[in-house]
Design a protein with these regions (language model features):
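Serine-hydrolase catalytic machinery in alpha/beta-hydrolase-like enzymes
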Residues: 3-100
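Short alpha-helix in the alpha/beta-hydrolase fold that links the catalytic acid
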Residues: 42-43, 168-178
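Flexible "cap/lid" loop of the alpha/beta hydrolase fold
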Residues: 65-77, 134-155
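Short beta-strand immediately N-terminal to the catalytic nucleophile in serine-hydrolase-like folds
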Residues: 105-107, 132
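Gly/Ala-rich beta-loop-alpha elbow adjacent to hydrolase catalytic centers
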Residues: 107-111, 115
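A conserved short beta-strand
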Residues: 124-137
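Short beta-strand/loop motif that positions the catalytic acidic residue
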Residues: 157-160, 164
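C-terminal catalytic histidine-bearing segment of alpha/beta-hydrolase fold enzymes
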Residues: 173-216
């Protein structure tokens, strides 16, 4: 796989027309490894209609789909590649966020790594984060991760199955430590979901978004 960005700016699927979405809270969907912007977009109709949903395609080709940053077989990554991917999304967000009163991030798997990275780089920019069957990046002491500014007030939903066969234990351990220190956490464990999303979880996400974003 090449490190070259396939698209100069993200390809985005919107749930509403440009006229309809202006002034509505923005919910940005970030798909997982090897998927595309269609993957999570089917969930848009199951979430509160008050949101304008934008499902963003990752910039790097991976098989028939796309990825935010390269992975090795052990799900390892380069922090610099993660930061480059987050720049790609932040540059796009900077061009659209002025049309919305708030921005919330929803990421699945690698998309959760992206969502939490975006929050850590811009701690004041996001109303909430939803992480589904994913992890937060261990950025070490890299200055671009502004964890010291995250004081536990930003709401975050983290749903996962303890039997998830994809996300490795070291990544769960790091993520557990990070969320406990830096966000207002709603954590839910599911059974029989494996590395996926189920109807019960989407119901919980719906409640979380309504309570933590729309009712604020």
């Amino acid at each position: 796989m090449t490190d070259a960005v396939v698209f100069p700016s993200p390809i985005v699927l919107w749930s509403k027309s440009e006229e309809e979405r202006e002034g509505k809270p923005l919910l940005v969907m970030l798909h997982g490894y090897g998927a595309n912007e269609q993957d999570l977009f089917s969930l848009a109709g199951l979430l509160p209609d008050e949101f304008a949903v934008a499902s963003v395609r990752a910039p790097l080709m991976m098989g028939p789909g796309f990825t935010w940053f390269p992975l090795t077989g052990s799900i390892d990554y380069s922090v610099d590649a993660v930061l480059k991917a987050s720049d790609y999304v932040l540059d796009w967000l900077d061009g659209v966020k002025h049309q919305h009163p708030s921005v919330t991030l929803l990421g699945f798997s690698m998309g959760m790594a992206m969502a939490t990275t975006l929050l850590r780089r811009r701690p004041a920019d996001f109303a909430a984060v939803v992480g589904l069957s994913g992890f937060a990046v261990d950025g070490g002491a890299h200055a671009d991760f502004r964890d010291g500014e995250l004081d536990g007030t930003v709401p975050m939903f983290w749903g996962r199955d303890q039997q998830d066969p994809v996300i490795t234990p070291d990544k769960i351990e790091f993520t557990m430590g990070w969320v406990r220190r830096h966000v207002k956490l709603t954590k839910v464990l599911y059974t029989g979901m494996w590395h996926g999303i189920n109807e019960q979880e989407i119901g919980h996400v719906n409640e979380f978004l309504t309570h933590e974003v729309l009712n604020k």
